[in-house]
Every structure is written in C-alpha cells, then in structure tokens.
Amino acid sequence: MTNIRKTHPLMKIINSSLIDLPTPPNISSLWNFGSLLGACLAIQIITGLFLAMHYTADTTTAFSSVTHICRDVNYGWAIRYLHANGASTFFLCLFIHVGRGLYYGSFALLETWNIGIMLLLSVMATAFMGYVLPWGQMSFWGATVITNLLSAIPYVGIDLVEWIWGGFSVGKPTLTRFFALHFILPFIISALTMIHLLFLHETGSNNPLGVSSNSDKIPFHPYYTTKDSLGFLLLILLLMTLTLFYPDLLGDPDNYTPANPLNTPPHIKPEWYFLFAYAILRSIPNKLGGVMALILSILILAIIPLLQPIKQQTMMFRPLSQFLFWILVADLLTLTWIGGQPVEDPFINIGQMASILYFSLVIFIMPMICLIENKMLKW
C-alpha cells in the first residue's frame, strides 16, 4: 500500500517540500536560517495573537494595556518580551539569510530573490508598526519622524502624510490603523513565504561550491530536519536568554514613558535593526535625498543580479570578492553603531563616509572586481 504522505493531496505538498525534497548534500549551517526564519515567524504570530487579546488600540489606554499585560495577565511579561525580543532574533536571522544569499550568489535565482526582497520590506514595515503600538515616547516620536519622511515627496507629500496619520498629527486613527496592519501583515508574510519556497523548489537550492548538485542529492528528512533542529535549539537558547535575563537590553528606556506630544526625547532612534538605514538617512543633509538614500539602501538588493555578472554562483573561489563582502559587513555594522549615536561630530562624518562606502561597494567596486575575476578565470 502506498504511503499516505505520497498520495493525499495536502500531505503530498508537505512531503515534497519538507520530507522527500531532494537537497544538495553539502549545504552548510548558513542554510539553516531559512527554517529559523519560519520558526521566528511562528513564534511572532503565536505571541502576537495572545498580546492582541489583551491590547487596546486607543491612545488613552494603549500604554496602560501593555502594563496590564505585563503585570496582571498570566505570563503576560513572558509573552510580551518573547514578542519584542523575537523581533530582534527575526531580524538577526534575516540579515544572516540575506548575507548568505549575497555571499553564495543566491541572487541568481531571480524569482526567489525578488520575493525575498518583498518579504524583507514586509517584515520591516510590520516591525515599524509594532514598535508604535506600546505608545511610549519613542513609539510616538518614531512614528512621527518616520511617517513625516513621506512629506519629502513633491506635490503629494503632505497630503499623503495626513492621509496615513488620519488627521493633522499622529493620534488615535494612526494607532488604530497601525494595529490593524500590524495584525494582518504577518499572515501576508506567511503567504509570501510559501511563494518564496515554491520558487526555491522550482530551481532547487544553491550550495557552497556553486556547482550543480543534480547528480548527487539527498532527502531533506532525516538529514536536514536533524541539522535544523540544532539551529532551533540555539535560536530558542538565544531568545530565552534575552527574554529571561536581559529583556530590555535591545529596547529603549524612553519607551517606558507614556507618549507626550509636548515633550521631544533628546535622541529619537528606531530599534537596532533599522539603525543602518537610519544612519544613511541622517548622513544626507537634504530631506528628499535622505529619503531616497534610505529607500535605495534596501531596494539596492533588487539590482544586485544586474550589477554582478557572476559566472560562479559562489564567492568561495573569489578571494577579492570575499574581501569586499566582509568590508561591506563591517561597513553595515559601523552604520548600525552610528545610527544609535547623537547627531554631532565625529559621528556625522563617520556616517557620511560609511554611507558613501556602502553605495560605492555595492554599485561600483564589487561589480568591477566581479568582472576582473571573471577575466582572471578566463570566463
């Protein structure tokens, strides 16, 4: 009798995606982060659902409702901090996942890469709106500053900002719509994830050597399910350590003060995972220029397949590209550090230099080195 997982219409899809999926035998632990992102998404949806049961999206009671969750709801503090720190682990896995895609040339799988960029933008939008919900000082002023950037768009900018706000400033309508969008977006992200996987399974995974593995593949289960389970354990260890020992390590103390439109915090900054983009935004003195640089800093990923004419789908045998990749990583870490510093010398100059280096590396230097390496390899 044929196994039910191979005949049942629904089980067949799960079987071909997670059990009998032909997988390259040599993919490293860096390929674990896709499944870890799935785990992070599941954690965020479950904890978020329980938080939504007790949260009220109203400017007068939002802050109090979060306090109520932490003090009065059974394990409310754990759910709240798992959700907040879960976002940080989500972005950590996301950045490593994108970095692995760049290092091992996964951007050559165009459909998968483009859906991945859509996923990245959706997760960033969700995280931004989630940060507004506790209605603390940094929530309110972060929402004001970031939404206000749209006013830089010529002609329609101011109307667009007021349309998003639902009034003439960030207030109750803004909070209500942000909560509605924050609730629905993770389910859209789940749908996009399935499309992402669908396109990935059309072409098959890349591997560290960048060569075709069609001649030698192994089933996903039990080999990679076992390997991924170690990743899950380490992820849970990190998340639990953050939640139980250092719950406020990555948060902002200002967010424990209720939102006050009459009192601006001395230094408005987003969560750590947006600091690199925030540093790029601040390093350009012109408002419209800053907004364009901010958007381009993420959307530049979409043009990488056009910029880098790789003949080998990996950097493993291209030492010059490897060197530049790690300079890019160091540059992004520098931008993250600068984004959290006040707007004064020497941070302004360092931020400007790091921003110039970021765009130069991705648009000019790395593609040039790529061409040189192709020539050296006689390709």
UniProtKB/Swiss-Prot annotation:
Location (main, coarse): mitochondrion
Cofactors named for this entry: heme b
Binding, heme b b566: 97, 196
Residues bound to a ubiquinone: 201
Example of a GO MF term: metal ion binding
Domain of life: Eukaryota
Keyword Membrane carried by entry: yes
Membrane topology (UniProt): Multi-pass membrane protein
Transmembrane segments: 33-53, 77-98, 113-133, 178-198, 226-246, 288-308, 320-340, 347-367
GO cellular component: mitochondrial inner membrane; respiratory chain complex III
Presence of keyword Kinase: no
Pfam families: Cytochrom_B_C, Cytochrome_B
PANTHER family: CYTOCHROME B (PTHR19271:SF16)
Additional remark text: Heme 1 (or BL or b562) is low-potential and absorbs at about 562 nm, and heme 2 (or BH or b566) is high-potential and absorbs at about 566 nm.
Subunit structure: The cytochrome bc1 complex contains 11 subunits: 3 respiratory subunits (MT-CYB, CYC1 and UQCRFS1), 2 core proteins (UQCRC1 and UQCRC2) and 6 low-molecular weight proteins (UQCRH/QCR6, UQCRB/QCR7, UQCRQ/QCR8, UQCR10/QCR9, UQCR11/QCR10 and a cleavage product of UQCRFS1). This cytochrome bc1 complex then forms a dimer.
Functional note: Component of the ubiquinol-cytochrome c reductase complex (complex III or cytochrome b-c1 complex) that is part of the mitochondrial respiratory chain. The b-c1 complex mediates electron transfer from ubiquinol to cytochrome c. Contributes to the generation of a proton gradient across the mitochondrial membrane that is then used for ATP synthesis.
Similarity comment text for this entry: Belongs to the cytochrome b family.
Protein name, entry field: Cytochrome b
Organism this protein belongs to: Lepilemur leucopus
